[in-house]
């Protein structure tokens, strides 16, 4: 007898023939067409306006035309749509006071795994290994429609090349993770999406991998993909100019300090001399040494850099939830989970998040003042724009 998946010897002709194709595939289940799901779960005009405005603002910040910061903040991953809406309501209520920040809620439904584990709401929405992907896609799309209709733009990690067909029209900013930044498939995907994309440095700490990904994705590509009707097709893209680096640290240590930011900016400038060297810093992952309690420490360093006028810093990522920490799914399943606590990476709680964003908003104002004073002292503005106030070519936030 042969163990499962082991090829039988050629002399066992009938058994051998069965192992020529799909030898390790258990079966196929139909997947809903993207066009059908979009028809059934429709975004409102208000949601579409929120999405488009956030895309435009994020692109301007990345290009250096708006002096605010893009802030990607929210749970490490979404495992409860109800809790995600509760978090979004907190975020929406507080957003107006952070006029120096473009707040985009982290709404990740797919999780890359270093080893094995829960792969996210789309893959396993019931958290029980039943892999009801059609249900997961519907839940994810409905949640993004609800969040954006509330006035909260959303961010998504692009983990595969198919799920964006179901969700990309609702997204204002996307990320390519450390494990996939070097992947040609993901670079091709990023070249065709309609929103800004950040590339994380590699798991080994290499920033050049992210810089190369930016350069690749900003150019046109042709590749095999899937249409909204679910048909295989040749996809031809124009290239995405709204791309940037995300510093997330690595197994070798953090890379959020000023010298790391400037080194990354120099690498971007060398590769794309005509573009603003936009750098986003991830307060979690390698930069926090995988301890969510270190995220405020990382943010303090970012604030110090902003306060002295650093213009390459254009964004921040924070893993935040209603309550702090993380938890594993207990044997009894979702019913045994603590409310508002991540089931993947640890997150800071809402109260800590507010303190962090208050500090960050103040640091943006300090940077704005530093730059304005420098420009006025030197008698020119070089056409630098910030959000809202215009002074001889310099637009700053608030007064016109």
Where do the language-model regions lie?
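Conserved phosphate/anionic-ligand binding catalytic regions in large, soluble enzymes, centered on
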Residues: 70-83, 285, 345
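Gly-rich Lys/Arg/Thr-decorated short loops/hinges at beta-loop-alpha junctions or inter-strand turns
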Residues: 34-42, 71, 237-251, 337
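Glycine-rich phosphate/diphosphate-binding loops that line cofactor/substrate pockets in enzymes
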Residues: 59-68, 270-275
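N- or domain-start disorder-to-order transition segments that initiate the globular core
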Residues: 7, 18-65
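Conserved, mostly hydrophobic/aromatic
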Residues: 74, 281, 349
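Asparagine/serine/threonine-enriched low-complexity, disordered tracts
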Residues: 378-382, 387, 392, 397
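Active-site-facing alpha/beta catalytic cores
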Residues: 2-5, 16-20, 88, 94, ...
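Internal helix-turn-beta structural module
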Residues: 321-371
């Amino acid at each position: 007898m042969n163990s499962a998946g082991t090829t039988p010897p050629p002399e066992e002709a009938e058994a051998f023939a069965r192992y020529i194709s799909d030898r390790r595939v258990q079966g196929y289940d139909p997947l809903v067409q993207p066009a059908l799901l979009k028809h059934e779960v429709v975004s409102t005009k208000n949601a579409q306006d929120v999405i488009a405005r956030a895309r435009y603002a994020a692109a301007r910040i990345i290009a250096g035309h708006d002096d605010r910061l893009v802030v990607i903040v929210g749970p490490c991953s979404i495992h409860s749509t109800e809790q995600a809406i509760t978090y979004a309501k907190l975020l929406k209520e507080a957003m107006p006071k952070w006029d120096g920040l473009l707040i985009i809620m982290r709404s990740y439904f797919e999780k890359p795994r270093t080893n094995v584990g829960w792969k996210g709401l789309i893959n396993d929405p019931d958290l029980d290994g039943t892999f009801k992907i059609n249900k997961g896609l519907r839940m994810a799309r409905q949640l993004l429609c609800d969040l954006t209709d509330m006035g909260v733009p959303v961010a998504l990690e692009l983990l595969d090349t198919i799920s964006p067909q179901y969700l990309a029209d609702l997204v204002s900013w996307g990320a390519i993770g450390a494990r996939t930044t070097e992947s040609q498939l993901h670079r091709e995907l990023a070249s065709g999406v309609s929103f800004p994309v950040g590339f994380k440095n590699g798991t080994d700490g290499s920033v050049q991998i992210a810089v190369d990904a930016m350069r690749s994705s900003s150019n046109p590509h042709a590749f095999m993909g899937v249409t909204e009707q679910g048909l295989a097709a040749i996809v031809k893209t124009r290239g995405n100019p709204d791309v940037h680096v995300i510093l997330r640290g690595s197994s070798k240590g953090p890379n959020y300090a000023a010298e790391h930011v400037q080194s990354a900016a120099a690498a971007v400038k060398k590769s794309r001399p005509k573009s603003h060297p936009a750098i986003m810093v991830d307060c979690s992952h390698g930069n926090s040494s995988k301890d969510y309690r270190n995220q405020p420490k990382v943010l303090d360093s970012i604030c110090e850099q902003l306060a002295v006028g650093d213009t390459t810093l254009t964004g921040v990522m924070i893993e935040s939830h209603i309550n702090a920490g993380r938890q594993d799914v207990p044997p009894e399943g979702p019913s045994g989970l603590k409310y508002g606590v991540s089931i993947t990476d640890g997150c800071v709680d809402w109260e800590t998040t507010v303190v962090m964003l208050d500090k960050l908003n103040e640091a943006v104002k300090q940077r704005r003042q530093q730059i304005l004073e420098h420009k006025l002292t030197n008698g020119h503005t070089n056409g630098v724009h910030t959000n809202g106030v215009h002074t001889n070519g310099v637009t700053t936030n608030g007064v016109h």
